[in-house]
Structures are given as C-alpha cells and as structure tokens.
C-alpha cells in the first residue's frame, strides 16, 4: 500500500476534460495511488471507466482505489476500497473483500477517530486539514488535530483537504504517511507539472529529514 501521493477524482474537474488522458498525465507526474470517486455517473459508466483505469494503473504500477462502491472495486480487482460513515460499515466491507484489498476510512474529527481504532481498516483519511473548495460540506480539523490524530492511532493517516505543494512539508512533519489531493493536481491545466511539484515537495521533506539525522 503506497498512498504517498494520492489523487482523488471529482466530478467538477471532468466536465470538459478527458478522464483517462488526465489520469495518465498525473501518473507520469508521479502519483502513487488513484482513488476513483464520482457521484454523477451510472454504474455501467463507472465500471467501463474503471476497467480502462485498472489497465492503466497496472501498467505504471500505481494503486487503484474505488470510493464507496465495493461491488465495482471487486469487479475490476482494485487494490483498495475507500468508505465513509454513510457507506457500508467497514466490517461488512471486510467480509465482502476478504484480504483481496485494503480498506480506507474517512474521519473528520478526533472524537470519531477514537471510535474507529477497532475497525478492520488499513488506513484513515483525515481532514479537512486546510480550507478547501472541493467539498462544500467539509469540516475543518486543522494541522494541530492531525498531529494529535497521529499519536492516537496505530493506523497510517493520509491527510486530505486543501493540501498544496507548499503545505506538504507541514503535513508530513505532523506525521501523515501520505497526502490525498484533488485540486492541487486537477485544478491545473498542466496536470503533470502540478503532480511533479507535489512529488518534489514530498521527496524534499524526506531528503531533509535523512540529512538532518
């Protein structure tokens, strides 16, 4: 499971943009994982797109995660499935997928984090760390809550929400194992370049950490 640079798709960014070529640019820029998340497509549309994306991600050794739809994740042999509190409970998801794929779970408060430690999940998506324009109903948790969250759980935390290349260092310093982004990549015309800037910031943090020991 490598969710270092984790791109999450969103309907708003694909109204007049080709999905597959855009994702390929992000992959070439260096994303390590892709979460397929769409709310306004039919099951058939999503299945057909996921088949193409599964081939693409395999070719580049990038992990494919499906948001919410366990059935589609199983149908295309995704690497993981990501759910939230309004989706199927993680213990039910685990029964369905067995050990074939990992499970991610969204958490937006320290209180909820305490409740999910016992769940059969493999990573936690925690946020929103910063202000974001991607989600209208998001809850801002902040960087200090991220620091506390990392200390409260044994599960790896992937930070999400308003993360840009110049905030990568702060998020990783707080203990996040990876960064999940939408607009930091998809909000730019040059998707590959935007991805490369995130990857550069990520590598720079670990390089500095290595040499500061």
Label each region the model flagged.
Residues 1-88, 95-123, 141, 148, ...:
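Conserved N-terminal beta1-alpha1 strand-loop-helix module at the mouth
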Residues 38, 128-130:
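Short, histidine-centered active-site or binding-site loop motifs used for metal coordination
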Residues 73, 130-136:
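A short acidic, helix-capping loop that chelates divalent metal ions and anchors anionic groups
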Residues 88-89, 132:
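A short, polar/charged loop-to-alpha-helix boundary motif
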Residues 126, 158-163, 179-183:
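Glycine-rich beta-strand-to-loop/alpha-helix junction loops that act as flexible
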Residues 174-178:
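Internal alpha/beta core interface subdomains
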């Amino acid at each position: 499971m490598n969710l270092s640079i984790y791109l999450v798709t969103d309907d708003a960014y694909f109204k007049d943009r080709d999905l597959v070529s855009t994702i390929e640019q992000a992959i070439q820029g260096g994303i390590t994982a892709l979460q397929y998340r769409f709310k306004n497509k039919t099951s058939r549309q999503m299945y057909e797109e996921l088949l193409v994306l599964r081939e693409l991600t395999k070719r580049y050794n990038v992990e494919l995660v499906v948001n919410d739809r366990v059935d589609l994740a199983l149908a295309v042999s995704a690497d993981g499935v990501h759910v939230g509190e309004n989706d199927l409970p993680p213990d039910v998801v685990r029964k369905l997928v067995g050990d074939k794929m990992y499970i991610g779970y969204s958490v937006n408060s320290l209180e909820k984090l305490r409740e999910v430690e016992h769940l059969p999940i493999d990573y936690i998506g925690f946020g929103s760390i910063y202000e974001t324009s991607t989600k209208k109903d998001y809850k801002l948790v902040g960087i200090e809550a991220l620091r506390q969250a990392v200390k409260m759980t044994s599960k790896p935390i992937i930070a999400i929400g308003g993360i840009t290349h110049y905030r990568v260092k702060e998020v990783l310093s707080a203990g996040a194992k990876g960064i999940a982004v939408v607009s930091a990549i998809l909000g730019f015309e040059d998707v590959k370049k935007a991805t490369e800037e995130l990857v550069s910031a990520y590598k720079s943090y670990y390089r500095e950490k290595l040499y500061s020991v």
